[in-house]
Curated annotation (Swiss-Prot):
<keyword id="KW-0378">Hydrolase</keyword>
<comment type="similarity">
    <text>Belongs to the transglycosylase family. IsaA subfamily.</text>
</comment>
<protein>
    <recommendedName>
        <fullName>Probable transglycosylase IsaA</fullName>
        <ecNumber>3.2.-.-</ecNumber>
    </recommendedName>
</protein>
<keyword id="KW-0326">Glycosidase</keyword>
<feature type="signal peptide">
    <location>
        <begin position="1"/>
        <end position="29"/>
    </location>
</feature>
<dbReference type="InterPro" id="IPR023346">
    <property type="entry name" value="Lysozyme-like_dom_sf"/>
</dbReference>
<dbReference type="GO" id="GO:0005576">
    <property type="term" value="C:extracellular region"/>
</dbReference>
<dbReference type="GO" id="GO:0016798">
    <property type="term" value="F:hydrolase activity, acting on glycosyl bonds"/>
</dbReference>
<dbReference type="InterPro" id="IPR008258">
    <property type="entry name" value="Transglycosylase_SLT_dom_1"/>
</dbReference>
<keyword id="KW-0732">Signal</keyword>
<dbReference type="Pfam" id="PF01464">
    <property type="entry name" value="SLT"/>
</dbReference>
<comment type="function">
    <text>Is able to cleave peptidoglycan.</text>
</comment>
<keyword id="KW-0964">Secreted</keyword>
Length: 233
């Protein structure tokens, strides 16, 4: 399928201006006029935009830490990549749940992604193949160490989601793992006739729950609005 990509439009939206990458120079967010909040939003909620075009023309190497996550955006002028992960392996201080590593990343042009892109002008025609964004939720053990009296657990995916919730809310990962175990038994696609769905059984008003990322975002919104009372605590 032929598709025209306006690569510069994403750069304008992000406010990436006034920077020319030199050989071997790594540009941190502070060195260029970058809207960090918008980049973070793209990484968590609009991966398709980052997959479709680089954030600016030419080579760049941008890294910054925000809200407990390390964000990376790089390009050699021909291919580009982006990723985010928990900064500095921040799993210390979370009790009762095995340490987790959470990474979302996309590497345009890599062997794994099987995407072809020929960088020309910002209005060039490109031949592209749809590529997935990888979401890696993993724990060092095969199951959660939180187990309720009825046998429910948070499961591997739920334990990783609990770690991320702890980083984003300040509530312990063990508390979130217990909520996940009680609400969904660690089932990502759990659905209740009331309309509640996902690991955290959030209602539609808090946002979509098609992916684990969306389920985490919806749970964060519910927590910010109602605290743990959203889950009856």
């Amino acid at each position: 399928m032929k598709k025209t990509i306006m690569a510069s439009s994403l750069a304008v939206a992000l406010g990436v201006t006034g920077y020319a990458a030199g050989t071997g120079h790594q540009a941190h967010a502070a060195e260029v006029n970058v809207d960090q909040a918008h980049l973070v939003d793209l990484a968590h909620n609009h991966q398709d935009q980052l997959n479709a075009a680089p954030i600016k023309d030419g080579a760049y190497d941008i890294h910054f830490v925000k809200d407990g996550f390390q964000y990376n955006f790089t390009s050699n002028g021909t291919t580009w990549s982006w990723s985010y992960e928990a900064a500095n392996g921040q799993t210390a201080g979370f009790s009762n749940v095995a340490g987790a590593d959470y990474t979302t990343s996309y590497n345009q042009g890599s062997d794994v992604q099987s995407v072809s892109y020929n960088a020309q002008s910002s209005n060039s025609n490109v031949e592209a193949v749809s590529a997935p964004t990888y979401h890696n939720y993993s724990t060092s053990t095969t199951s959660s160490s939180v187990r309720l009296s009825n046998g429910n657990t948070a499961g591997a995916t739920g334990s990783s989601a609990a770690q991320i919730m702890a980083q984003r809310t300040g509530v312990s990962a063990s508390t979130w793992a217990a909520i996940i175990a009680r609400e969904s038994n660690g089932q990502v696609n759990a659905y209740n006739p009331s309309g509640a769905s996902g690991l955290f059984q959030t209602m539609p008003g808090w946002g979509p729950t098609n992916t684990v990322d969306q389920q985490i975002n919806a749970a964060v919104k519910a927590y910010k609005a109602q605290g743990l009372g959203a889950w009856g605590f």
